């Protein structure tokens, strides 16, 4: 991230083929580094901006220059002069917010002269009265009638004063605020008539109620000084999915007989400000916090809805979107209820106030605040939009199309502007119609991957595909992808590392031999195991691996064929059964049988199971997301339930993240998005297996929902040799708890059209999250989950409660499938 202190450090250059648009180049800027280091850098040649946010308010001092720089850029832009003027138009915003549910605004009478088109149409609230003027002179009778009706209306509530002000871009921060007693309408009329003479087109004169400060009983009797008023500043940000999220709230406290303004009061937290005014009762404070959250988020929702209907010219550019908003509120009593009322919107003052409060903890020897910075969600949005901009138009080759659970790949690729070329064995795969180029090629025989990589490279060259990257999200095709990348000179982890991670026994045995340095060595996380290819191997393994153990396919996925074995006879029986039932790809497509049906026996370790999804670039850990798994239905290991984020203690969470990361590095996995399965035992994390690709099932969807980070976008960026810019310490915005549905347990539910319609309806309504993992309802001994049903909540307990209720209502919970037991780990 770069800070430009002068417009002269930036330059716009017209973009060929994109009429009216320009790229933004940075020739000089302040750069920031960990540890508080800053440098003044000169860039030769200039750098291309991938996101631009300018200070456009009157307080910025360089508003005109910044406005011109922000207009019609090809890169994502956080605001523009055009949008800023709309936000600062007090009447327009008040009219907009008055129509938003859950947002209260002061009672307002507006005299408008040739109002803007955005103000025409729609219904305002009873507390907002718009009077259109045909001219600026000869309006005395109309003004007198309207003012007298307004000051006597019930909409003003307990307000004893009204303010009269001009509204329009010219008047931002340039006028005093005259206050008048409500019982003296003649002075209000005279003030309005005097201001009407100054109006130009699309401007207005506002008469608005001054919300009376809350009179709170102070302990020990009345306060010796004047009554106090609280001014609230809320910062709300646009996050993934164009949803508003309240980031932080700070307050100013001042005299109740005059307006409390920015820069004239010291910022403090809401709870401290309320305590100063005598409000400390927890339930009341929590209720008020929720009201502020709803009002602030409702304000941004209204702005985003308005913005969606604007033309490119009205927004100031194709890439302009409002990414954050400052909301000024005041506390008042409406109908005996303490209510936050939105006074105005701004583009920077509230964020500045939050920064001033956060700056308190930067002083040496003072404890630091554990709260997230107010700008953190904004920075996440900047990074996400910047990444999307970098990937727009990139050409990627995808090896293996996967099944219905990977439908999101093709939808997201279109949204991100990616051009995809697909290599797939099935000539009739639905994804063949969703890509730029489809190459039909049999990739199921993985023992010929090296030969196939050479053949595919020739096909790519023959078609003259100009690739920026190549990747796969399908287990079976990972080694082939690495070999092809090496042949084409594209970024990827080495094929040897992919082979090592793909074969489960090789992974464990290799890590067991890694004794360090560095310390702790990866051998501490590996588990004793033995590869099995024939019956003699089974006999040897029984004596080498402590029992009970886990027997599984070397190259398997989805927990198909994985079973707990307690003694020698069970080992022999399960090995023989798998050898007979699962001989090749045709017996169970998509679980790795194209690599053969070799097995392994590994030690069974007690503990809680966890998934760690990592983003690694150049051998550096960029992000990690930990989820918890519920108990499985032994002796099988098919997943039952999951919870995100993890319920592990912070130290244990750090241990599983570091264990997963070190195991990946130990295998040579230096670049990519990886999924690592571990158990947290009494002795620390132990490795189950490494999946050298993006996490499957619901994981990408959940991480995107909770953290705003898209593992698919990160995967494609790494595949193109670009480092994803991800938040260093992402915080989850709630919890998700999910349960798997199996054909063997839920066939009646899943085959019923009405039940499936109910699931889809609940998903569309936001009552649950439905992730379809399989397309066909195929019963069998070796099954994979058909779908995942999840519920969100502010805590694991609340999410579990909602999910259990839905499972009981729909029939997912049953005697042979006790959902409450599967969720018991998450309390």
UniProtKB/Swiss-Prot annotation:
Described by its record, this protein's role is as follows:
Catalyzes the synthesis of carnosine and homocarnosine. Carnosine is synthesized more efficiently than homocarnosine.
Q: Which organism is it from?
A: Mus musculus
Q: Which residues participate in ATP binding?
A: 542-611
Q: Does the keyword Nucleotide-binding apply?
A: yes
* Residues at which Mn(2+) 1 binds: 677, 689
Question: Subunit details for this protein?
Answer: Homotetramer.
Keyword terms of this UniProt record? ATP-binding, Ligase, Magnesium, Manganese, Metal-binding, Nucleotide-binding
GO terms of molecular function: ATP binding; ATP hydrolysis activity; carnosine synthase activity; homocarnosine synthase activity; metal ion binding
Binding residues annotated for Mn(2+) 2, in chain numbering: 689, 691
User: Which residue intervals define the domain ATP-grasp in the entry?
Assistant: 516-720
Which GO annotations describe the biological process of this protein? carnosine biosynthetic process
Q: Which cofactor does it need?
A: Mg(2+); Mn(2+)
Annotated Mg(2+) 1 binding sites: 677, 689
Which Enzyme Commission numbers does its entry carry?
6.3.2.11
**Cofactor info, note text:** Binds 2 magnesium or manganese ions per subunit.
Q: Which reaction does it catalyse?
A: beta-alanine + L-histidine + ATP = carnosine + ADP + phosphate + H(+); 4-aminobutanoate + L-histidine + ATP = L-homocarnosine + ADP + phosphate + H(+)
Tell me the residue numbers annotated for binding Mg(2+) 2: 689, 691
Q: What is this protein called?
A: Carnosine synthase 1
Would the keyword Transcription regulation be found if you checked this record's keyword annotation? no
The record's listing under Pfam families reads: ATPgrasp_N (PF18130), ATPgrasp_Ter (PF15632)
